[in-house]
Amino acid sequence: MGQKVNPISFRLVRTRDWRSKWFANKKEFGDLLVEDQIIRAYLLKKPALVGVSAIKIKRMSGKVEVTIVTARPGLVIGKKGAEIDVLKGELSKLTGKEVWVAVEEVKRPDMDAKIVADSIAKQLERRIPFRRAMKKAMQSSIDAGAFGIKVQLSGRIGGAEIARTEWYKEGSTPLHTLRADIDYATGRAETTYGSIGVKVWIYRGEDNLAKKEA
């Protein structure tokens, strides 16, 4: 079963946390869910938001708190927080609510699956050979302290006439083990031959809670 489900949702509460934290009744739930998607899509289109791992959203008494998790916080914050103020204004106008924006830094970007997946996708768009892009990303993750990594590409890889799937793996990625801290993310490269999907699994060790319980 661990092979079939999303590794993040499979480990919610155990080693992972929700990216949206709020409660709503049946009437409001759908609207707020769509609003979360609109906020994330709007932010990810921003050129300044480079190396974004996740966008967390909290709601409380009519206010929205958006936390941008990124490897390059300086670009998001801007000079003297100018970019943050701009984002607050734009998101408030978009949602019609008071919005707070915070920035959280990714300490080890080479061990973050989303950042690694987006990095591989950008290299493919620049026509860097796919095997080189995959192996370079994997080696960087292992050097950063990852216990294992798996990278999968799907599509017309290298401009091939027939779409196929290629994957490489180094170390272990125990998807069935709930106490294993597995980071998983997807990316997409828009090449002249079409879209190429990127999937990345990174095993970062066992969570501290599991070790204490053992």
Curated annotation (Swiss-Prot):
GO terms for biological process: translation. Transmembrane segments: none annotated. One of its GO terms (cellular component) is cytosolic small ribosomal subunit. It holds the Pfam family Ribosomal_S3_C. The keyword DNA damage does not apply. It comes from the Bacteria. Keywords: Ribonucleoprotein, Ribosomal protein, RNA-binding, rRNA-binding. This is Small ribosomal subunit protein uS3.
